[in-house]
From Swiss-Prot:
One biological process term in Gene Ontology: fatty acid beta-oxidation
InterPro entries: 3-ketoacyl-CoA_Thiolase (IPR050521), Ac-CoA_C-AcTrfase_FadI (IPR012806), Thiolase (IPR002155), Thiolase-like (IPR016039), Thiolase_acyl_enz_int_AS (IPR020615), Thiolase_AS (IPR020610), Thiolase_C (IPR020617), Thiolase_CS (IPR020613)
Name the UniProt record assigns to this protein: 3-ketoacyl-CoA thiolase
Record bears the keyword Lipid metabolism: yes
Keywords in alphabetical order: Acyltransferase, Cytoplasm, Fatty acid metabolism, Lipid degradation, Lipid metabolism, Transferase
Protein family according to the UniProt entry: Belongs to the thiolase-like superfamily. Thiolase family.
Subcellular localization(s) per the UniProt record: Cytoplasm
Pathway the protein contributes to: Lipid metabolism; fatty acid beta-oxidation
The organism's taxonomic lineage, starting at the top: Bacteria, Pseudomonadati, Pseudomonadota, Gammaproteobacteria, Enterobacterales
Reaction(s) the record says it catalyses: an acyl-CoA + acetyl-CoA = a 3-oxoacyl-CoA + CoA
SUPFAM superfamilies: Thiolase-like
Organism of this sequence: Pectobacterium atrosepticum (strain SCRI 1043 / ATCC BAA-672)
Length: 437
């Protein structure tokens, strides 16, 4: 549906974000090496509760996501509830929408508040690319199942004798789309070629992302929304994202070779977001509940939308499909926005989506609209940098973007912000946020 859809409770309350927090993000196998996503989720949720001063018993619902799931704890949300002092009666369930996972968590909490089933909830996500579910081959997995049913030692030995040495090798998690076999970087290369995105344009966007993120850290504007993380073995603390290049220089980017299409490609490690560990969460409640608790909301959820497209080509166009829906449901136009924050999975993907925002042909042929959303004012776009600089713990990125946008809107005296992301599987997400003066 594309008509205006006010997000209010049955009592007429808006959906309020009271607080948001994240851990510093760390590149794979660095500061959080060996720390599972569950522990990162507990860490950020505990600190969020402490900082807001809210009684943990008041939390009625926690919706959390994890993209790289661990088999031993498939419901990360419930483990966070049990490990952070909330009531054992607090409902909790996990969601996964690839890179848009915490957008989904926020939408689910919002829907529960609108339905009147809860008044207070936490949404977020955590991921670790350093603690991975290492699997076994299909042959070994089948043999282990059969051995469990074997009755005698002889039967078990006969089963084992059918294995080959290669069957005993560990199997790393897949980095490609299940349905196509394409890696995300392969899709980014497709998009660069389809939409004529040059290597120079990609490198410039990556440089801009790092430069603005470095300025944000140096100015101190991120301090209140990023906690200091102490993790085992508790020898060092991490207080800043360790992927941000404070000395980024544009000439450095041209030295890297293509990472996916080695001969003709333009997507490199430098103009892509790295594998990252981290967690982020937001505290949500009805507007009247916040008032009764004496809490001042950061801002409000004005609208949201999700989208899905084909996965064979250019599947990372989620922002171009979901954003028009979110804006229409909020009853606003692109020109009404104060800020636009788009997830930078790859510079090529980001630039392709920006092109389609301004394409009348795309609007008519793919969206059924009379005209394009419009050209994005770069002065409003990813003003604090983006995922290429901060990193991308898959399930945490949406909550980071929401908190960051709300805080920046407050610093600017209020306004409307669009946060939007692409996701694996041809999925997309967009949310319109509002901060009143």
């Amino acid at each position: 549906m594309s008509e205006v859809l006010p997000l209010i409770t049955r009592r007429g309350d808006r959906i309020a974000f009271v607080s948001g927090l994240r851990t510093p993000f760390a590149r794979q196998a660095t500061a959080y090496h060996g720390v599972p996503a569950i522990e990162l989720g507990k860490l950020v949720t505990s600190e969020l509760l402490v900082r807001t001063g809210i009684d943990p018993e008041l939390i009625e619902l926690l919706v959390f996501g994890q993209v790289v799931q661990m088999p031993e704890a498939p419901n990360i949300a419930r483990e966070i509830v049990l490990g952070t002092g909330m009531s054992v009666h607090t409902d909790a369930y996990s969601v996964s929408r690839a890179c848009a996972t915490s957008f989904q968590a926020v939408a689910n909490v919002a829907e529960s508040i609108m339905a009147g089933t809860v008044e207070v909830g936490i949404a977020g996500g955590a991921d670790s690319s350093s603690v991975l579910p290492i699997g076994v081959s299909k042959a070994l997995a089948r043999t282990l199942v059969d051995m469990n049913k074997a009755r005698t030692l002889g039967q078990k030995l006969r089963l084992l004798s059918g294995l080959r040495p290669k069957d005993l090798l560990p199997v790393a998690p897949a980095v490609a789309e299940y349905s196509t076999g394409l890696r995300m970087g392969d899709t980014a290369e497709q998009m660069a070629k389809t939409y004529g995105i040059t290597r120079e344009e990609q490198d410039e966007l990556a440089h801009r992302s790092h430069k603005l993120a470095a300025q944000a850290w140096e100015s101190g504007v991120l301090r209140d929304e990023v906690m200091t993380a102490y993790v085992p073995p508790y020898e060092k603390a991490l207080s800043e994202d360790n992927n941000v290049r404070h000395d980024s220089a544009i000439e450095q980017y041209s030295r890297l070779r293509p990472a996916f299409d080695r001969r003709h490609g333009t997507v490199t490690a430098a103009n892509s977001t790295p594998l990252t560990d981290g967690a982020a969460a937001v505290l949500m409640m009805s507007e009247s509940k916040a008032k009764s608790l004496g809490l001042t909301p950061l801002g409000y959820l004005r609208s949201y939308a999700f989208s899905a497209i084909g996965v064979q080509r250019d599947m990372l166009l989620g922002p171009a499909y979901a954003s028009p829906l979110a804006l229409a449901r909020a009853g606003v136009a692109l020109a009404d926005l104060t800020l636009i924050d788009m997830h930078e999975a790859f510079a090529a993907q980001t630039l392709a989506n920006l092109k389609l925002f301004a394409s009348d042909e795309f609007a008519r042929n793919q969206l059924g609209r009379n005209a394009a959303l419009g050209e994005v004012d770069r002065a409003k776009f990813n003003v604090l940098g983006g995922s290429i600089a901060y990193g991308h713990p898959f399930a945490a990125t949406g909550a980071r973007m929401i908190t960051q946008t709300l805080n920046e809107l407050r610093r600017r005296g209020g306004g409307l912000g669009l946060t939007t992301a692409c996701a694996a599987g041809g999925l997309g997400a967009a949310m319109v946020l509002e901060v009143t003066p």
